[in-house]
Every structure is written in structure tokens, then in C-alpha cells.
Amino acid sequence: MFKKILSALCALPRTLRCTPHPKLIMTLLVKNEEELLAHNLEFHHAMGVDGFIITDNNSTDGTPHIIERYRKRGWVLHVINETATDYNQKRWVDRMVMLAKNQYGADWVINADADEFWYSPNNNLKTELCTTHANVLQCAIRN
């Protein structure tokens, strides 16, 4: 019995174990977000996000140029130019999460919209994540 429990504990996802320096990736699904996107990337990078994976769904404004600017800085790790018109948000977000985990080694993934800003009272999201053994967190939303 002890061996089964030990085996199960060893098989737990990395995120259930306390990770002293977690890798935090944010995924963004955007379309025509030139007004907010740079602010979002700057804010979350300052809050400890290590990198961004962005799916751009047929933007016709300056959004692709902003994405490219931050890709050149090394902040945007991966860009998916989604040309489909069916807006399959679940599939697209799941794809970004799997990339974050499998290709970029994310311990934590935050999915957000360009108008969502994730805040930590100590100004570092990773510090908050280091204190938990959970693999999913619930956060308060304020408008």
C-alpha cells in the first residue's frame, strides 16, 4: 500500500509540489487590441510573468506590430496567427496551454484577455504562487 501511495505522489504534476522558482507563462487570445496589449504585456512582465504565448485572431489594427515588438524583446515566446473564423476559444486556449506546458516548461499558466490585469498585493505573481501547493487557484475579479 505504501508503495502505491508513494508512486502516486511521485506522479503528481509539478504544480502540486512547491516550486521555489516557478516558470509563469501567460496566454492571450487577442483580436484588435492595439489600445491595451502593450499595457498588458508591460504590466504582467513587471508582475513576474516569464513569457507570453499569444493567439492573434485576424487582427486588422496595429496588434500584430505590437506582438512583434515584444517578440523581438524576448517576452513573447510564441505567436499563433489564427485565421479561422469559427472562434473556437476553448480549442485555441487549450492549444496555448499545452504549448506553455510542453514546449516552454511552464509550472503555472494564466490565461487572460487583453483587458484583464492580474495583480498581486506584493507586486509579484510568482511570489504568491510559491506559497501554494494547489494546482488551480481561484481569484477575485474586480471591475
Q: Model features per residue range: what roles?
A:
Residues 105-119:
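Short beta-strand-to-loop acidic/aromatic patch adjacent to the donor-nucleotide binding site
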Residues 46, 102-103, 111, 131:
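Alpha-helix termination/capping residues and helix-transition junctions
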Residues 1-42:
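N-proximal low-complexity "stem/linker" segments adjacent to membrane-targeting elements
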Residues 50, 107, 135:
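Short acidic/polar active-site loop segments enriched in Thr and Asp
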Residues 50-58, 78-82:
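Short beta-strand/loop segment that forms part of the nucleotide-sugar
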Residues 42-51:
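Short, acidic, metal-binding catalytic loop of nucleotide-sugar glycosyltransferases
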Residues 64-109:
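Active-site-proximal specificity loops/subdomain of glycosyltransferases
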Residues 120-143:
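Conserved donor-nucleotide/metal-binding helix-loop-beta segment in metal-dependent transferases, i.e.
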